[in-house]
Amino acid sequence: MEKLFIPKGYKPLLSLRETEVAIKELKDFFEDSLAKNLNLTRVSAPLFVNKGSGLNDDLNGIERPVSFDMKAMPEFNIQIVHSLAKWKRLALHRYEFEHGEGLYTDMNAIRRDEDLDNIHSIYVDQWDWEKIIDKEERNLETLKETVRSIYGTFKATEDFIVAKYPHIEKILPEDITFITSQELEDRYPDLTSKERETAICKEFGAVFIIGIGGKLASGEKHDDRSPDYDDWTLNGDLLFYYPLFDEAVELSSMGIRVDEESLLKQLKIAECEERKELPFHQMLLEGKLPYTIGGGIGQSRICMFFLRKAHIGEVQASMWDEDMIRTCEENNIHLL
């Protein structure tokens, strides 16, 4: 059994059947609101890609994708996606989207090397979204404006759920707070990055941490990011304080994507310049792909947060070891 936290005296606010109904209602409302607020069109998404395309998300660079071959095309090494971070940018180009327009997908992924706990599963379901911007819009104001729009969807969703289920109380603050990862380190120099996240979220309730992937003044990173989609100076994580855990919980990771210059710079820093030869990276360096902003929003995380669940397995069906299943059952945590 991996790390498991049992909230003292936990009792679910909804039954199993009520939970399933609420999940559908919540997802439908959030999806519609997000699409309207960001001007997004839903598109079909791949479950797997060819390794040689360079389209899979390498995450932190050490996670192993699930891979397989197929009888019809034995020459291909096919990978289950980790996310669609790079695929979406290519799709905007292929589908001929215009400036100010975007797309979103229902993304399903398998992350086989995930460490299992209350909020982590090997099954990942999220809304992956991407939107075209101008090069001149690659700045912090564009990032913040987009974060505020997304936070508006979170606020509207909380209102919707509380109206449906009055015994669930509101906990989100009126506004989102912005802070850079360096400001956060300066504020809490003796804490780890995760401890900093909880400290700042306990103070403000909802926080967007700007600038993730590059090294801070201490020489450490706030967190890892793949070098070939987010610009590490124009990205961030959206976190909420979750009273049930007395911790910060990340609901979304997003950012303005790399341009030609930042891609080359970050590939060099990450010591993986060989990726420049992959088809996706070649298109980007040749100026064939649009400038974009995009991210992923965890569907199960959102359901868990708004329905006040103690374990992500209460809102999604996945794989858990017998010790975790038994311990959860003994503590009123009913895994699907």
From Swiss-Prot:
Which Gene Ontology cellular component terms are annotated?
Answer: cytosol
Catalysed transformations (reactions): L-aspartate + NH4(+) + ATP = L-asparagine + AMP + diphosphate + H(+)
The alphabetical list of record keywords is: Amino-acid biosynthesis, Asparagine biosynthesis, ATP-binding, Cytoplasm, Ligase, Nucleotide-binding
Q: Cellular location of this protein?
A: Cytoplasm
The processes (GO biological process) annotated in the record are: L-asparagine biosynthetic process
Checking InterPro entries in the record gives: aa-tRNA-synth_II, aa-tRNA-synth_II/BPL/LPL, AsnA
Q: What is its EC number?
A: 6.3.1.1
Give the principal location in a single coarse category. cytoplasm
Coiled-coil annotation: which residues?
none
Q: Which GO terms describe its molecular function?
A: aspartate-ammonia ligase activity; ATP binding; catalytic activity, acting on a protein; transferase activity
Keyword Ribonucleoprotein assigned to the entry: answer is: no
Pathway where it operates: Amino-acid biosynthesis; L-asparagine biosynthesis; L-asparagine from L-aspartate (ammonia route): step 1/1
Amino-acid biosynthesis as UniProt keyword: yes
Family annotation (HAMAP family): AsnA
Show the NCBIfam families listed in the entry: asnA
Q: Which family does it belong to?
A: Belongs to the class-II aminoacyl-tRNA synthetase family. AsnA subfamily.
Spell out the protein name for this chain: Aspartate--ammonia ligase
Native source species: Clostridium perfringens (strain ATCC 13124 / DSM 756 / JCM 1290 / NCIMB 6125 / NCTC 8237 / Type A)
